[in-house]
């Protein structure tokens, strides 16, 4: 599981950029993460025009690979993750 301090930093960045909700999904939720795993983060409420600049900010400020998804744009994926229980709200 990814360290809490990293999750807090990710959440702080995303909330400051206007995200209303922040989610963790993937291997860090299912317990299959290893040292090479990326951190799968999804958001709701982010202005779509800010997506790439926010992703770049995460990339520059977090010393781990981030997979970043806008769940407002990918609602079917969000619903799927929710239905199988492989998502956790972190902010």
Model-inferred region functions:
Residues 37-39:
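Periplasmic OmpA-like peptidoglycan-binding domain that tethers envelope proteins to the cell wall
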Residues 1-23, 29-35, 46-91:
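Catalytic core of pol beta-like nucleotidyltransferases
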Residues 42-44:
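Short hydrophobic/aromatic beta-strand micro-patches
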């Amino acid at each position: 599981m990814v360290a809490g301090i990293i999750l807090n930093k990710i959440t702080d960045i995303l909330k400051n950029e206007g995200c209303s909700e922040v989610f963790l999904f993937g291997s860090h939720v299912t317990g299959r993460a290893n040292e090479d795993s990326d951190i799968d983060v999804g958001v709701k409420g982010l202005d779509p025009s800010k997506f790439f600049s926010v992703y770049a900010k995460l990339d520059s400020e977090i010393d781990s690979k981030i997979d970043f998804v806008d769940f407002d744009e990918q609602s079917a994926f969000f619903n799927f993750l929710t239905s199988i229980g492989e998502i956790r709200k972190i902010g």
